Amino acid sequence: VLLIISTIAFTGCFSSGKKSDDKNTVTVFNYGDYIDVSVLKTFEKETGIKVKYEEYVTPEDMYTKYKSGVINYDVICTSDYMVEKMMQEGEAQKIDTSSMEYYKNIDEKYLDFCKAFDPTNEYAVPYLWGTVGILYNTKVIKEKVDSWSILWDKKYDDQIVMQNSMRDAFMVPLKWNGISLNTTSQKELKQAQS
């Protein structure tokens, strides 16, 4: 069995344009299982600020729920491309990092990565860095796996699972075909679909 593992290429947290009204509560929207409940409890104990923590599965799910306006979020943790989209739509607020003691300890390379979607580093704070890869059971797959091509090998039909991520579903075939992961060419995107 093959498993495509993907951790978000780059995840940033940003302050949404729709803040909650309660000054003693911070409403956070993040991927499921990304922050342990004990961390939230420790934060509440140390600061006296209550955390209302909401989870989502994919950035697209997050976007749909956010845009519905049902809940106003103070902090949203999502992927790089979604931060950029929401900035372009005016849905993100600038973050004052001067009061964040740890901000000066963030390695410059991560702040530089953020500049790809937040050129002035004013809207997002680096949160997670991840990767995409292939995990496989060596008892089932005997040959060495060193290429994305194994995903299209007929002998492994119905034995491959992939994370529920629209972006990753396109990223893998684009990468395999030597196409930029950020292409906007309809021809290249259709090639990735086939």
Where are these regions (language model features)?
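Short amphipathic alpha-helical interaction patches enriched in hydrophobic/aromatic residues
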Residues: 6-7, 177
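C-terminal motif of bacterial Sec signal peptides marking the signal peptidase cleavage site
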Residues: 9-12
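Sec-dependent N-terminal signal peptides
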Residues: 1-4
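Early extracytoplasmic/lumenal segment of secretory-pathway proteins
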Residues: 14, 18-86
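Extracytoplasmic ligand-binding site segments that recognize negatively charged/polar headgroups
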Residues: 72, 77-194
